[in-house]
């Protein structure tokens, strides 16, 4: 990765023919590739060494010059420069075209840029380019105007002449007829014969008239066409055009093909066109105005940049370097070649044939056909299949063109620039390593040796085990004994990165210190499985090796697993004891009545352990034990005279004493049963109180204790543990009677089918719940299944209910709940019919999961793309704005409680304004951090809501500021400058995506209030894409009174505004559930019926702030309904990006165009500038964009092109001559620079390291420490390998 900060911009533009020739090292004239006998490139062909460079390093084509000493010489015999062969990856050639061709991206893209510029419909443009119509490129209006009377007179003369000729011909026919009639009369002919003669004469006359009229009409048509001829007119009638050219060729010019487009562009006045369009926009309406706006964008793009519209027509085509379109020999002597070579060959063949035809002076029709074929060949080279049928190769496969090389997952952007593969990596199956510490992983010896090979070889040479690197390599390959000792030494404190695919969030890659293990499997610490979502059923993981000292320091400080205990999405611990460990700790901390040793008192823990060993005291029996270093817990009643720090006699169990020994010494005594919930709260509390190293140590202790006691808990499962409740038959009987009654009412026609279904579902749901409760009551506390589920180690009550109680209601393939339940449990066994209906749900579940994974992955990708440039750029933007969030809720019974979502709304933020109690005493200043303690304090003081900073109100010009973001949830500290909070937000929202359901829940086919409520993942996508939901619920546009109009045909809600304006009527479906009644008063933006609201309507009626709130609340509603906790700030980051743009309505005196989408910051800047100069500011409307659209609308063309619609983005960017400011992450990854986030920021890189006094003293006293150290260039990267990574927290880098 280069860290060249001089590269500040990346510009794209239209290449002119001269630029293409400037890039080129020579013209490719022949379609040949390589000689079939010598296998060497053909001269002037597509692989020519003279143009592209030698195929062998330092060797010319003919072999006259070999070796590096001739570097730079151009061989006089073969013309090849003696240089490295790798120049064949860089040097371009070109094809000089015999006729210009248009660039298909600008003509065929949507919208057609050429069409907009020339004001031609794409259909007409196509006719011109592909030689189906002539285009008038210039008209000499003045000359035509001057000569019009003469030309009119000439036409009139010609018409008169035609009329005279017609009349003369008719008279001649009439004379002949008279003569013939007279002759027939003389001969005594019959009347029939005369009639025949007359008819024949009439026919002749009619033909003469018709022919003459046709000629006169044609003449008039030619004249009218010429008289009204203007530039840009098309003429598809070849004969008519020829006639015009013959008669009036000196007054106009016209042509076909790309040449006519080129001529037109050469004379095109951009400034005049822009002025005319602005005029149209100011005065026009409707369709005309819209089209003028769109055209102005294109015209303006050429006016305001150095781009020339002529760049859209090509006179030369660049030929990319041969190594990028290689030709390789296969085993059978055949060749595999890149499709581009075929496409280039077609272009060269057609171009050469066209040159030959032009030299021969071939007829125009043949030349035009060849030009059309050349145009098509260049089209298919640039974008095969964009127009007409694609060019296919063998097996009818469409060939991959230059556009296809960039597009899609396999394209250049996503495959090579954003998805590079790395060396120093390996992968293997994972197995559990319960003996490891949290920061360790077990690395198989062979794998470690391969990964650390260069380090081992260097060390072998340093220790004189080998004379040189070559012999060291041989030693490593032969697994000599010394190698293993050196390997042990080399891997000490050199972290490795472990990664498990799919990497859904940043905890999917973590650093560990490797421990060498036998076998071929990587050993993974059991507590990090949650973060990786790993299990040991055959999962594989990849290992990567950070090489440079900087990379190692980053891995150790930022990525070490013991520093990543908290989840970035909600700040909860993710390294939690699970399964076996929970069972062990639960077993350890439960209390049992009547066990051995109950009520005894012991003088010390040691004595109690001894009693346990001898069988006198059971682990779970209540007893009194004298404890040293006892830290009391809340609610412990201290005996009289007891002082903190003194020993205390505590009533507890030996198990709980052992459990507390795993916790830090100064942690309050824990007298609770250690189930999953309690352990989570415990680790959460530890993370709040102690540094991460201490928490990691405690977690390891808990893990060891958990495994140890799990193996002694005797948890097994037997069929006898699955006890069906004896009350089940009686319960079922009662509910069956109710169901029969409902069925009877239906049979009699008292209720309809929907009511029957809903009643039955209700009845059987109650029955299921009652059986489940009976089953739970029936289970003994010692029952192992009960212990497993109660402790949270495995399974849930629903699963137990299905095994031991009742299977209950299931869904059919449509997703509707069937009103017939499965009455058996798995323990009792299902009947055939029950088994059959149960299979539907199971199959749908599996299909669902597969779909969900793909959809969730795509959602994450779009979220990352839209938010990747949201980086913390400054410590405080000094804004006074913020959000008001509730601290407390009032329950249904009227009791005030702490808001249940406070952890994911207020926690971890910064106060925007000071908080005072009722007496006006300030409890917290603005800028205070909302920690758990602070929230408790404010709640206790009776504060019900607080104003906090939020990224939604942040005023940083680029990225966001640390104060508006608040705490980084992963570290529990205020977020660092440089933190990529956008990507963290995207990962936090995308990672639980797979847990969300795909279905739209059906309430058993019952017509619910608003059809089927879209839930789960589809709802999240609908919100983030800002789509109008299906069956949208209306919201009131004004404040007023409700009047409900219920007619036979429809149901309408009418709002009568308070201010007496026109009424608003909202037609609603009959089955919709109304939220308002007749006569109610509604406020602006109040929802009128249940259902999903259109966020665009919320924005229009209630404004951006309410739209943001609505989106955040709706997204959180979906996640909370699934029991997934995500902090609001992550959703806010995404919503901020969706509402970042403004559509310009009035441009005022600014440079902004009406209808243009601009960034809020740019809009405000332009307006400030205009107001400062006393000009009119622009007016704009905030725009809510879906995440896909917002990603494509980013200022960075590199980022947008690598996301979706690559060709469209590049076409637009090149036309506008866009510059990419390289502020986001993707752009910098693409061009190979360090990302401007985290440790890639300049402030962390421009640091001078100076040795301290101690280090200097060490240098003089112990030369060995700095044996390899020099201030020479090669060691500028950092100190030698003996030095450990230094925690970056100890340094003050200035600025925060």
From Swiss-Prot:
Summarize the protein's role: DNA-dependent RNA polymerase catalyzes the transcription of DNA into RNA using the four ribonucleoside triphosphates as substrates.
Gene that produces this protein: rpoC
Tell me the Pfam families matching this sequence: RNA_pol_Rpb1_1, RNA_pol_Rpb1_2, RNA_pol_Rpb1_3, RNA_pol_Rpb1_4, RNA_pol_Rpb1_5
Q: Which cofactor names does the annotation list?
A: Mg(2+); Zn(2+)
Q: What is this protein's name?
A: DNA-directed RNA polymerase subunit beta'
- PANTHER family in the record: DNA-DIRECTED RNA POLYMERASE, DNA-DIRECTED RNA POLYMERASE SUBUNIT BETA
Q: Which family does it belong to?
A: Belongs to the RNA polymerase beta' chain family.
Sorted keywords for this record are:
DNA-directed RNA polymerase, Magnesium, Metal-binding, Nucleotidyltransferase, Transcription, Transferase, Zinc
Q: Where is this region: Disordered?
A: 185-204
Cross-referenced SUPFAM superfamilies: beta and beta-prime subunits of DNA dependent RNA-polymerase (SSF64484)
Q: Which GO terms describe its cellular component?
A: DNA-directed RNA polymerase complex
Q: Which InterPro entries match?
A: DNA-dir_RpoC_beta_prime, DNA-dir_RpoC_beta_prime_bact, RNA_pol_asu, RNA_pol_N, RNA_pol_Rpb1_1, RNA_pol_Rpb1_3, RNA_pol_Rpb1_3_sf, RNA_pol_Rpb1_4
Catalysed reaction per UniProt? RNA(n) + a ribonucleoside 5'-triphosphate = RNA(n+1) + diphosphate
Q: What is its EC number?
A: 2.7.7.6
Locate the residues binding Zn(2+) 1: 60, 62, 75, 78
The species this protein belongs to is: Kocuria rhizophila (strain ATCC 9341 / DSM 348 / NBRC 103217 / DC2201)
Top-level enzyme category: transferase
């Amino acid at each position: 990765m280069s860290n060249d900060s001089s590269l500040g911009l990346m510009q794209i533009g239209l290449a002119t023919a001269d630029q293409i020739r400037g890039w080129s090292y020579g013209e490719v004239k022949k379609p040949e590739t390589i000689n079939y006998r010598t296998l060497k490139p053909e001269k002037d062909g597509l692989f020519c060494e003279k143009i592209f460079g030698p195929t062998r390093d330092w060797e010319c084509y003919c072999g006259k010059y070999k070796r590096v000493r001739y570097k730079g010489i151009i061989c006089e015999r073969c013309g090849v420069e003696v240089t490295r062969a790798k120049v064949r990856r860089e040097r371009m050639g070109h094809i000089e075209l015999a006729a210009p061709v248009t660039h298909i991206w600008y003509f065929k893209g949507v919208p057609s840029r050429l069409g907009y510029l020339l004001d031609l419909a794409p259909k007409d443009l196509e006719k011109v380019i592909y030689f189906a119509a002539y285009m008038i490129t210039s008209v000499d209006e003045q000359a035509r105007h001057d000569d019009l009377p003469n030309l009119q007179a000439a036409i009139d003369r010609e018409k008169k002449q035609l009329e005279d000729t017609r009349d003369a011909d008719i008279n001649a026919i009439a004379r002949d007829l008279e003569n013939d009639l007279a002759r027939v009369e003389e001969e005594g002919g019959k009347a029939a014969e005369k009639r025949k003669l007359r008819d024949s004469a009439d026919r002749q006359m009619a033909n003469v008239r018709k022919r003459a009229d046709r000629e006169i009409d044609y003449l008039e048509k030619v004249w009218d066409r010429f008289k009204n001829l203007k530039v840009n007119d098309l003429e598809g009638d070849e004969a008519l055009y020829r006639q015009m050219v013959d008669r009036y060729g000196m007054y106009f010019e016209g042509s076909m093909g790309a040449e006519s487009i080129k001529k037109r562009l050469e004379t095109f006045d951009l400034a005049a066109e822009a002025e005319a369009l602005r005029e149209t926009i100011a005065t026009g309406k409707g369709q005309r105005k819209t089209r003028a706006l769109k055209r102005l964008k294109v015209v303006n793009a050429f006016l305001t940049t150095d781009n020339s519209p002529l760049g859209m027509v090509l006179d030369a085509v660049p030929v990319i370097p041969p190594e990028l379109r290689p030709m390789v020999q296969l085993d059978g002597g055949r060749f595999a070649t890149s499709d581009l070579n075929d496409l280039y060959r077609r272009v060269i063949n057609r171009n050469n044939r066209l040159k030959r035809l032009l030299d021969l002076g071939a007829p125009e029709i043949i030349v035009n056909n060849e030009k059309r074929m050349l145009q098509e060949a260049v089209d298919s080279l640039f974008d095969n299949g964009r127009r007409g049928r694609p060019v296919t190769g063998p097996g009818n496969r469409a060939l991959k063109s230059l556009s296809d090389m960039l597009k899609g997952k396999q394209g250049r952007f996503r495959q090579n620039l954003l998805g590079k593969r790395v060396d120093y990596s390996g992968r293997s199956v994972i197995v559990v390593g319960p003996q490891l510490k949290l920061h360790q992983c077990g690395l198989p010896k062979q794998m470690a040796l391969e990964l650390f090979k260069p380090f081992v070889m260097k060390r072998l040479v340093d220790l004189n085990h080998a004379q040189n690197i070559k012999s060291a390599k041989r030693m490593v390959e032969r697994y000599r004994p010394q190698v293993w000792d050196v390997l042990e030494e080399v891997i000490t404190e050199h972290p490795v990165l472990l990664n498990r695919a799919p990497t859904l969030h940043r905890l999917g890659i973590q650093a560990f210190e490797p421990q060498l293990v036998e076998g071929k499997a990587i050993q993974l610490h059991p507590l990090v499985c949650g973060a990786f979502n790993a299990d040991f059923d055959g999962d594989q993981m990849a290992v990567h090796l950070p090489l440079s000292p900087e990379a190692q320091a980053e891995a150790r400080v930022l990525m070490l697993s013991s520093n990543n205990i908290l989840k970035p999405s909600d700040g909860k611990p993710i390294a939690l004891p699970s399964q076996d460990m929970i069972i062990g700790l639960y077993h350890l901390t439960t209390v049992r009545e009547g066990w051995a040793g109950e009520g005894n008192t012991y003088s010390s823990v040691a004595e109690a352990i001894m009693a346990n060993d001898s069988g006198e005291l059971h682990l779970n029996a209540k007893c009194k034990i004298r404890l040293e270093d006892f830290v009391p817990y809340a609610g412990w009643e201290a005996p009289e005279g007891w002082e903190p720090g003194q020993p205390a006699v505590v009533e507890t169990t030996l198990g709980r004493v052992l459990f507390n020994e795993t916790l830090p010494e100064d942690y309050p005594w824990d007298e609770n049963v250690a189930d999953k919930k309690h352990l989570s709260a415990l680790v959460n509390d530890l993370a709040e109180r102690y540094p991460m190293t201490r928490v990691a140590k405690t977690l390891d202790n808990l893990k060891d204790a958990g495994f140890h006691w799990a193996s002694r808990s005797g948890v097994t499962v037997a069929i006898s543990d699955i006890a069906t409740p004896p009350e089940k038959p009686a319960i079922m009987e009662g509910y069956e009677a109710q169901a029969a009654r409902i069925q009877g009412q239906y049979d009699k026609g008292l209720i309809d089918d929907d009511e029957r279904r809903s009643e039955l579902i209700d009845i059987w749901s109650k029955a299921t719940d009652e059986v489940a409760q009976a089953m739970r009551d029936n289970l003994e506390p010692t029952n192992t299944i009960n212990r497993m589920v109660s402790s949270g180690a495995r399974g849930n009550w629903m699963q137990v209910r299905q095994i031991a109680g009742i299977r209950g209601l299931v869904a059919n393939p449509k997703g509707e709940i069937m009103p017939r339940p499965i009455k058996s449990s798995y323990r009792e066994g299902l009947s055939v019919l029950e088994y059959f209906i149960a299979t539907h749900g199971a199959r749908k579940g599996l299909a669902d999961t597969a779909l969900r994974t793909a959809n969730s992955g795509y959602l994450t990708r779009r979220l990352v793309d839209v938010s990747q440039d949201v980086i913390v750029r400054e410590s405080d933007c000094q804004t006074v704005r913020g959000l008001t969030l509730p601290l407390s809720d009032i329950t249904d019974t009227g009791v005030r409680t702490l808001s249940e979502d406070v952890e994911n709304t207020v926690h971890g933020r910064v106060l925007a304004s000071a908080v005072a109690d009722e007496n006006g005493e300030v409890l917290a200043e603005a800028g205070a951090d909302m920690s758990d303690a602070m929230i408790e304090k404010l709640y206790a003081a009776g504060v019900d809501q607080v104003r906090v900073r939020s990224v939604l109100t942040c005023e940083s010009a680029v990225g966001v500021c640390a104060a508006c973001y608040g705490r980084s949830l992963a570290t529990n500290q205020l977020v660092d400058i440089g933190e990529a909070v956008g990507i963290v937000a995207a990962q936090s929202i995308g990672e639980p995506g797979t847990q969300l359901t795909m279905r739209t829940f059906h309430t058993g086919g019952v017509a619910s209030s608003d059809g089927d409520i879209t839930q789960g993942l589809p709802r999240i996508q609908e919100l983030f894409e800002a789509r109008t939901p299906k069956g949208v619920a209306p919201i009131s546009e004004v404040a007023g009174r409700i009047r409900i109009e219920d007619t036979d045909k429809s149901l309408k809600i009418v709002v009568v505004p308070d201010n007496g304006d026109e009424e608003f009527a909202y037609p609603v479906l009959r089955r919709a559930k109304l939220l308002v009644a007749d006569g109610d008063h509604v406020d602006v933006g109040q929802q009128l019926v249940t259902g999903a609201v259109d966020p665009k309507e919320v924005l229009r009626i209630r404004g951006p702030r309410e739209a943001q709130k609505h989106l955040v609340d709706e997204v959180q509603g979906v996640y909370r309904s699934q029991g997934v906790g995500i902090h609001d700030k992550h959703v806010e980051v995404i919503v901020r990006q969706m509402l970042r743009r403004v559509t310009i309505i009035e441009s005022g005196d600014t440079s902004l165009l009406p209808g243009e989408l601009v960034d809020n910051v740019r809009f405000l800047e332009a307006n400030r500038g205009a107001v400062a100069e006393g000009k009119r500011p622009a007016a704009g409307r905030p725009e809510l964009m879906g995440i896909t659209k917002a990603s494509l609308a980013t200022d960075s063309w590199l980022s947008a092109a690598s996301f979706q619609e690559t060709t469209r983005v590049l076409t637009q960017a090149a036309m506008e001559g866009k510059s990419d400011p390289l502020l986001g992450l993707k752009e910098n990854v693409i061009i190979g620079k360090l990302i401007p986030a985290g440790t890639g920021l300049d402030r962390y890189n421009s640091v001078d390291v100076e040795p301290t006094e101690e280090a200097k003293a060490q240098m003089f006293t112990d030369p060995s420490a700095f044996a390899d150290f020099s201030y020479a260039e090669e060691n500028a990267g950092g100190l030698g390998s003996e030095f450990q990574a230094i925690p970056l927290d100890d340094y003050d880098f200035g600025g925060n």
